[in-house]
Amino acid sequence: MKPFCVFLTFFLLLAASSKKVDSAETVSFNFNSFSEGNPAINFQGDVTVLSNGNIQLTNLNKVNSVGRVLYAMPVRIWSSATGNVASFLTSFSFEMKDIKDYDPADGIIFFIAPEDTQIPAGSIGGGTLGVSDTKGAGHFVGVEFDTYSNSEYNDPPTDHVGIDVNSVDSVKTVPWNSVSGAVVKVTVIYDSSTKTLSVAVTNDNGDITTIAQVVDLKAKLPERVKFGFSASGSLGGRQIHLIRSWSFTSTLITTTRRSIDNNEKKIMNMASA
């Protein structure tokens, strides 16, 4: 092979290898407020967009109200071609307000579900949080901010943050001090290398609540999912559930170590020929 051809082949293989090393699929968005006509957001159930740009998830005048908001575009959280799983970081703020003559219920859940997710047909009663049937079962992974203790779902006796996997009977919970009218800021991180879902909840007085749990998203969810929020109320339990802001970034490496190694071997063989 002529020297120029050797150099050109070497250069192209090197470029291809470098591209594969850096190849990733990224989804990123940021909502400081919301509007009803935004095509990037899907609404389900009793959602209302307020004039101040907040999303109110439930209808206070309706028994067993359920409302959900989702990012409209599906996100690929793992690859069937490579087996790789995405890592993600999301931050959001919300507010829950008690109302007169009702128990404060039932809370908000940040959830991940199949891309065709809808409010479950049997999702009545506040304890379902709009993501499960009346037995507590569904197809989702979520972080719940629960303000009502439902004994049928083994809730602890206090307000709590819980990590849910296909059920509102949480796999792990920690106590949390929910304050009516307080703006709560949350950061959720999923580290695909350790399969760990970590959550930090900051109340407006500076108190921080943390919780973490190993969750294999590839084993629990399909390749393409949607991210969103849901809330629900019941006959005697209602409160105002507001989503104020939301940012999100996910990264899925789209190449395998094997494909990178193969290119590197080709480069070394060409260099030694």
From Swiss-Prot:
Record's signal peptide: 1-23
Transmembrane domains' residue ranges: none
Record bears the keyword Ribosomal protein: no
Source species, domain of life: Eukaryota
The keyword Coiled coil is assigned to this record: no
Effect of K185I: In minor form
Note: Binds one manganese (or another transition metal) ion and one calcium ion. The metal ions are essential for the saccharide-binding and cell-agglutinating activities.
Function: D-galactose specific lectin.
Descriptive protein name: Galactose-binding lectin
Organism of this sequence: Arachis hypogaea (Peanut)
